Amino acid sequence: IYEDKEYHNAVFVGLDEKGIARHAHKRGTYTQGEPYKGNVEGSDPRYSFHWIGKSSKLYVFEAPVDMLSFITLHLKDWREHSYVTLDGVSEHALLQQLRQNPHLNEVFLCLDHDRAGIEADGHLKDILVENGYTNTAIMQSTYKDWNEDLKAKHGVEPIPSEEHPKLILLPQVSAVLPDLCEALKAHRDIR
């Protein structure tokens, strides 16, 4: 991690298996409004910012700030586990770390608690299953993302989470299902 000279962005560098820089993600440090976020041109998305530990656990995040916030919230034995950022929701960096590190067989998807993050959780779980990884779990932040959880812990007003519209309807649909099933059973013999 370093600060770029021109705009004072935080730059998160991803290294390949030989320690060569292959990816850089910039995040603006300006605190008023939306900060700049983007990958440096020519970055290889397979080698995003990551940390590889000795345990079998891999935690997956949309962005480096989310990853660092999560680690700050879960400091106990953090160096033992592995972490990777997707710099969005693409699977390239996740699959690269799993291929490079065969000891990783427990995957925790820690994406943002918003519509895009929830949809990406489902998509990534499908990709993981297709690639033979079935020991997966979804960990959601209480607020919009792990950085917002960290802000809330320190008394700063967090951005709330956003549920997926289809998940909001789930309790309503679940409530009427038993009655619907009973009604269908009663009319089973109707042809």
What are these language model-derived features?
Residues 69:
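Phosphate-binding glycine-rich loops and their immediate beta-loop-alpha structural context
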Residues 72-191:
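TOPRIM fold recognition
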